[in-house]
């Protein structure tokens, strides 16, 4: 399993993949089940709450439904990976299942617990950008080589300048967090209870961002009769997110990096400032954007279930359960008028959106369990049905009377009102049988028959099987004398699951409004495809469990192969079908089943307990290898699926026979170091046909030299190729816990190896990327500046009678720092040096000290005098340090939502970086 934190914003989610990427376009996140109830909306994007524009198209942040849950209520998490385990969840378990169990009461006197925590978070890493002195030197060089004609008198002597404005330091803050929980548990032999209430307030490390949560939980179990048990699980949460446009080329992070250091944050009166300067364009003050623009998301969520266990006769139990998940959210955005130099916003604007989601789930199943001698048998048969409904209403308006008024109904502009609704439903029958002989031989069979409203009437139902067997060979007589070998088990499993995560009514054609010269009208929003059907998944799993020395040393090995067929995705159609255009005219392509994906891998877990007694050491090491391959694409003539960036840049492709999401671009071989080098190399698009070179309009010395992949002597789009995979070769985690008497120390390391990251911020932006060096008014990464191709005259004494300069004479220009792979600075960039290439692909491998916790539990004799059952204090550091070669903030980059296709992975477009958090906590039980 790989878990990638998509954003460092408080309340954000992780992108989790269980045994690889099993689908290309349908939801690839695992199923979360809390106390038997399915969690709705795993990692929803901001657009789901009406925040798509406010959070930007380049956003990789997602709003986590798990952020509404108090982690202190959780007692265990179990990950179901192989098909024999997930098959009972049918269509919902194709991407794996994460089972979360919360705390329950136990018989005995009431116990009260207080858990408190205070934390401080910081961004300890900085991207190496130019300070004012370095920027002045760079500006002067552009003047010296003719890229800029007007020198700036303020930069005449860079040595007397200071460092200027450090915009990174300005947007980051030391963020405070505190969390408090009070819980009570206890009960009698008949009734047990657990109740809790918690509050958390967490500042983000980007100024203005914040997350606040209040939650309560009640878990109740009552044995009313010998044959009847009732239970209730319920939790309510209320959260408020103060979000910021952090990600993407228009986000605060990128704006802070590309803002030049000679602009102050505030003027002499303490007001936000910007700059009025030719060439700067609509330059945003990132501090003003963070503090002036409001993006608020308020959520309320009620989740739980009511269940009963009835035992009418011996060995037979009937379980019935009604689950529910009801949520309401309100998003509010407000952008005030702005008059800050080149940054102008003529009108204020606001948008409100209300979302309501209602989910109910009904389960009934009978379980029969019996034992005859050494034979143990269980048989279960049941049904499940659920329905999920959603609706929203939104209103947008401009020209509000003042910045204190955010109600869109009071705006003087023309209001825009939107609404929508939809639903999905599923009905299922399932059965599972298990057989165990003498704790040696095990067999399990599972079958599930699902019907989903996400498909048309002809393809609504599908059935899926799984079977698994295991042999505990250490129970055999011939193993009795090997006392040091405590456990040995072979496992083999095969199973089918399915995927229906394409949304309700995706098989039909929806209606969308559109404006025309004749007034309002309606059009089809998408092309229908009633033939779309289930995406199926078949998985083999072979496992080996070994235990030695009374299980003080345990080894678990799993080999698996998982094949997904009939992939759910949008059909690739030519533009003449009407599938391209703006939002008011584009006709969405139909959903269909196209192709297959294969994941195969190896998982190894080593669990050891080397020391026991006063000093104890528990160690757990896990490593996972996964190979992902796009096996086939059917129903389309396309050989690959292309993911697009913010400006329709091709960033990645998924080609048959290769892993998904490979980056797609040019291979940089170096730079042209002389005219002779240009003439002896394949011709570029800007190679002069008449032989006359021009520094501003044709290829030039110092421009990038790209590899001629197809060897046709020309550099063009046919020379783009696979330039790296964002998927790791392996991931790993190592957890160590040391205990000495009352002290405990936990150290958790994790990492990833072999994955590449596209540092998109270096390549592209409104006025150029952070390493493109094609603008004098965009700050640049120091690594690029230091390694740039430095042009120098071959003959510095050559005289030009027409008054020309050496840098305009290609016969007299060479690169001084031979061997560099970074181009010359050029404002026109005729060679397109900032096109996607290996120059922007970096090694994303890392080793991270993820968690370090030191705790102390007070001795029992001390606690008894204070009338406490338990007192524990601890300090913790999260994300202490990351060992990596990646030049950005954080190499942990997952799926990107910068395009609705969802085909991009490992693209760092200025994401909200993950902070280092220092915390101190106390737990009291009495």
Predicted segments with their positions:
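Transmembrane beta-strand segments that form the barrel wall of outer-membrane beta-barrel proteins
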Residues: 116, 197-203, 443-452
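Short acidic/polar hinge/loop motifs at secondary-structure boundaries
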Residues: 37-81
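Short, glycine-/polar-rich solvent-exposed loops and beta-turns at beta-strand/coil boundaries
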Residues: 4-12, 89-94, 209-212, 246-248, ...
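A beta-strand signature from Gram-negative outer-membrane beta-barrel systems
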Residues: 1, 71-113, 177-179, 192, ...
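Residues on the lipid-exposed face of transmembrane beta-strands in outer-membrane beta-barrel proteins
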Residues: 102, 114, 182-186, 216-222, ...
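Conserved C-terminal beta-signal and adjacent last beta-strands/turns
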Residues: 618, 725-753, 836-883, 911-926
């Amino acid at each position: 399993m790989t878990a990638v934190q998509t954003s460092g914003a408080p309340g954000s989610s992780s992108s989790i993949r269980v045994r690889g990427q099993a689908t290309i376009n349908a939801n690839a996140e695992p199923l979360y089940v809390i106390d038997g109830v399915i969690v709705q909306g795993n990692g929803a994007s901001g657009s789901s709450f009406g925040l798509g524009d406010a959070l930007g198209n380049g956003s990789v942040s997602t709003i986590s439904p798990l952020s509404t849950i108090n982690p202190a209520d959780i007692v265990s998490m179990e990950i179901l990976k192989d098909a024999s385990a997930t098959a009972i969840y049918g269509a919902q378990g194709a991407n794996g299942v994460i089972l979360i169990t919360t705390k329950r009461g136990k018989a005995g006197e009431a116990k009260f617990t207080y858990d408190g925590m205070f934390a401080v978070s910081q961004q300890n890493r900085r991207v190496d950008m130019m300070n004012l002195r370095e920027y002045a030197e760079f500006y002067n060089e552009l003047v010296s080589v003719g890229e800029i004609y007007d020198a700036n008198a303020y930069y005449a002597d860079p040595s007397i300048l200071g460092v200027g404005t450090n915009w990174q330091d300005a947007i980051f803050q030391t963020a405070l967090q505190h969390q408090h929980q009070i819980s009570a548990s206890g009960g009698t032999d008949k009734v047990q209870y657990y109740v809790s209430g918690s509050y958390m307030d967490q500042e983000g490390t980007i100024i203005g961002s914040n997350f606040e949560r209040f939650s309560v939980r009640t878990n109740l179990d009552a044995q009313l009769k010998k044959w009847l048990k009732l239970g209730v699980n319920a939790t309510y949460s209320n959260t408020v997110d103060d979000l910021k446009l952090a990600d993407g080329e228009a986000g605060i992070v990128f704006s802070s990096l590309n803002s030049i250091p000679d602009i102050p944050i505030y003027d002499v009166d303490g007001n936000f400032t910007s700059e009025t300067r030719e060439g700067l364009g609509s330059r945003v003050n990132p501090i003003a954007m963070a503090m002036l623009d409001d993006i608020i998301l308020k959520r309320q969520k009620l989740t739980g279930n009511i269940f009963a266990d009835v035992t009418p006769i011996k060995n037979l139990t009937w379980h019935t359960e009604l689950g529910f998940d009801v949520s309401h959210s309100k998003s509010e955005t407000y952008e005030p008028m702005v008059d800050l130099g080149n940054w102008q916003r003529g009108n204020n604007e606001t948008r409100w959106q209300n979302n309501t989601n209602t989910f109910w789930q009904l389960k009934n199943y009978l379980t029969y369990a019996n034992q005859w001698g050494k034979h143990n048998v269980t048989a279960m048969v049941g049904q499940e049905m659920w329905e999920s409904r959603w609706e929203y209403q939104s209103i947008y308006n401009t020209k509000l009377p003042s910045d204190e008024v955010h109600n869109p109904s009071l705006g003087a502009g023309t209001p825009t009102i939107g609404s929508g609704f939809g639903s999905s439903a599923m009905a299922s029958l399932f059965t599972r049988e298990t057989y165990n002989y003498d704790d040696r031989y095990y067999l399990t069979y599972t079958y599930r028959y699902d019907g989903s409203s996400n498909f048309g009437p002809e393809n609504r139902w599908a059935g899926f099987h799984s079977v698994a067997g295991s042999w505990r060979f250490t129970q055999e007589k011939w193993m009795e004398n090997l006392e040091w070998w405590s456990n040995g088990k072979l496992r083999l499993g095969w199973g089918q699951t399915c995927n229906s995560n394409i949304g309700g009514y995706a098989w039909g054609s929806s209606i969308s409004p559109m404006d025309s010269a004749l007034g309002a009208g309606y059009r089809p929003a998408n092309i229908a495809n009633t033939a779309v059907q289930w995406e199926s998944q078949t998985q083999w799993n072979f496992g080996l469990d070994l235990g030695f020395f009374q299980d003080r040393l345990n080894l678990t090995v799993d080999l698996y192969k998982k094949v997904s067929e009939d992939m759910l995705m949008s059909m690739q159609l030519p533009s003449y079908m009407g599938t391209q255009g703006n939002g008011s005219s584009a006709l969405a392509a139909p959903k269909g089943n196209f192709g297959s994906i294969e994941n195969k891998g190896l998982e190894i877990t080593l669990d050891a307990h080397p020391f026991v007694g006063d000093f104890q050491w528990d160690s757990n090491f896990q490593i996972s290898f996964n190979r992902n391959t796009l096996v086939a694409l059917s129903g389309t003539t396309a050989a690959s699926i292309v993911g697009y960036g913010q400006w329709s840049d091709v960033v990645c492709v998924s080609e048959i026979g290769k892993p998904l999401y490979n980056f797609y671009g040019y291979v940089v071989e170096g730079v042209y170091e002389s005219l002779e080098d240009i003439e002896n190399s394949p011709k570029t698009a800007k190679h002069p046909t008449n032989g006359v070179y021009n520094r501003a309009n044709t290829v030039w010395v110092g421009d990038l030299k790209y590899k001629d992949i197809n060897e046709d002597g020309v550099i063009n789009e046919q020379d783009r190729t696979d330039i790296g995979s964002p998927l790791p070769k392996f991931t790993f985690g190592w957890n160590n816990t040391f205990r000495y008497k009352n002290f405990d120390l936990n150290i958790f390391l994790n990492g990833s190896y072999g994955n590449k990251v596209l540092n998109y911020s270096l390549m592209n932006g409104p006025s150029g990327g952070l390493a493109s060096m094609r603008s004098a008014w965009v700050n640049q990464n120091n690594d690029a500046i230091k390694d740039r191709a430095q042009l120098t005259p071959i003959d510095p004494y050559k005289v030009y009678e027409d008054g020309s300069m050496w840098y305009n004479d290609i016969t007299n220009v060479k690169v001084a720092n031979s061997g560099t792979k970074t181009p010359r600075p050029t404002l026109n960039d005729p060679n397109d040096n900032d096109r996607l290439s290996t120059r922007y692909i970096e090694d994303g491998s890392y080793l991270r000290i993820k968690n370090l916790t030191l705790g102390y539990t007070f001795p029992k004799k001390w606690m008894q005098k204070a009338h406490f059952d338990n007192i524990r204090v601890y300090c913790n550091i999260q994300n202490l340090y990351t060992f990596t070669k990646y030049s950005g903030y954080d190499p942990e980059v997952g799926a990107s939502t910068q395009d609705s296709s969802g085909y991009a992975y490992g693209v760092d477009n200025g994401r909200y970086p993950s902070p280092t958090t220092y915390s101190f906590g106390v737990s009291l039980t009495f």
